UniProtKB/Swiss-Prot annotation:
This is Pimeloyl-[acyl-carrier protein] methyl ester esterase. The lineage of its organism: Bacteria, Pseudomonadati, Pseudomonadota, Gammaproteobacteria, Lysobacterales. Its main location: cytoplasm. HAMAP family: Carboxylester. It catalyses: 6-carboxyhexanoyl-[ACP] methyl ester + H2O = 6-carboxyhexanoyl-[ACP] + methanol + H(+). It comes from Xylella fastidiosa (strain 9a5c). Belongs to the AB hydrolase superfamily. Carboxylesterase BioH family.
């Protein structure tokens, strides 16, 4: 699996969200590459890895990334957070975990009320079969909904998406299945490495309340929470400086 490597310093793995590719992290890469060696992952079926045979499944993807990277901090945005969290729960080489607009359980359950209804993801899966482009555009709009800079972020996401190979319908449906049916709350309870959880105050896809609830599950004393005021689901586009400072501070404090 192809992983782009850039920069110099302590290793940081970055994993993107649904339908996107690692180019979405450009605002962070610009500031972090002077201080960190960045491993920019395109998930199977996405971007530069659009032809890889690795299944879009947690253990397969995590194993492939781990085989190509040194001990590192793992950052996952949105869907990418599930892969980063699974890695942190199963691999000793994960020095720290950064969950960016990501939660161990993306859908509402009886004992997990601060999340979206599962129908959001199942409906997107159905709509993909009818109109691929319109469905992608609606999801990107949901990514930016509520953000102080929603229109600017939406333009950026559309440009970024089209800069590399776009994933096919089967790949996108596999990602939606992960979002709809994965529950890694037990992994949070048992976390060994320190973790930083970043929420967008105005995120409509992963409400800040769900990330706050996730941090309450994590071991006390090694868990940090940052809420980006005015941020939506992609706060690294609108608040890159604040994000960069938070990431660098967290990584600098790791043992």
């Amino acid at each position: 699996m192809y992983i782009e490597v850039t920069g110099y310093g302590p290793a940081l793995v970055l994993i993107h969200g649904w339908a996107m590719h690692s180019g979405v992290f450009a605002p962070l890469v610009e500031q972090l590459r002077a201080h960190h060696t960045l491993y920019l992952v395109d998930l199977p079926g996405h971007g530069y890895n659009h032809t890889t045979l690795t299944p879009l499944a947690l253990p397969h993807v995590v194993h492939a990334i781990a085989a190509a990277t040194p001990p590192a901090v793992w950052l996952g945005w949105s869907l990418g957070g599930l892969f980063a969290l699974h890695a942190a729960a199963t691999l000793p080489q994960v020095r720290g975990l950064i969950m960016l607009a990501a939660t161990p359980c993306f859908v509402r359950r009886e004992d997990w009320p601060h999340a979206v209804e599962v129908s959001i993801f199942t409906q997107f899966a159905e709509d993909l079969k009818q109109n691929y482009t319109e469905t992608i555009n609606r999801f990107l709009a949901l990514d930016t909904l509520g953000s102080t800079y929603a229109q600017s972020e939406l333009r950026q996401l559309r440009q970024i998406l089209n800069a590399r190979h776009t994933p096919n319908t089967a790949t996108l449906q596999a990602g939606l299945e992960l979002l709809a049916h994965t529950d890694l709350r037990r992994a949070v309870i048992d976390l060994t490495p320190p973790s930083l959880w970043i929420a967008g105050q105005r995120d409509r896809l992963v409400p800040a309340a769900s990330i706050h609830a996730a941090t309450a599950l994590a071991p006390s004393g090694q868990t940090e929470l940052l809420t980006i005021t005015g941020g939506g689901h992609a706060p690294f586009l609108s608040h890159a400086n604040q994000m960069t400072a938070a990431l660098q501070h967290f990584i600098a404090t790791l043992p």
